[in-house]
């Protein structure tokens, strides 16, 4: 994308990441304008720029371009594998679920979407399901290992009200295994609902 006549590349999937990137660029530009043109200070004899704190280095358009190009965000539309495509996304509110659904609808039209989902009981999970279930072929639910985790049975029952075949599992790894067993190579598996269970996932 182009912002203020500068071309930027980002590798974070999802149209909303462009808006996030523009916000970050605006903040960086404000910081850049506050710094002297030569940077915070010049190098002393014998100093190596690699060991100077980031705030003491010059910030400019090349640094901003490299920063965005190198940005990665684990757990946000993170591609874990292909054939079938497998994504991990920490969307845990209706807005995040809506952005996830928009991404899937744009890039995976006419493909079967299999959700692996666990949520916390204090989240608006019914509204999240309302965003996600119109695209769903199946859903495998589980309770995250968290005292606030919602029962997988409750989540499955809610999903069934949208007419989606729902299966309750013991944990995220069982849900992933069963989802993969059911998926064809052209399907899409989406692991979502919370960031809290990411560390529970086996490699």
What do the PLM-derived regions correspond to, one by one?
Residues 197:
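Adenylate-forming
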Residues 97-98, 125-127, 151-152, 200-203:
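Short glycine-/acidic-enriched loop or helix-start segments at secondary-structure transitions
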Residues 33-37, 181, 203:
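Generic C-terminal helix-cap and adjacent flexible tail
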Residues 194:
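Active-site-proximal loop/hinge segments that shape catalytic or ion-binding/gating pockets
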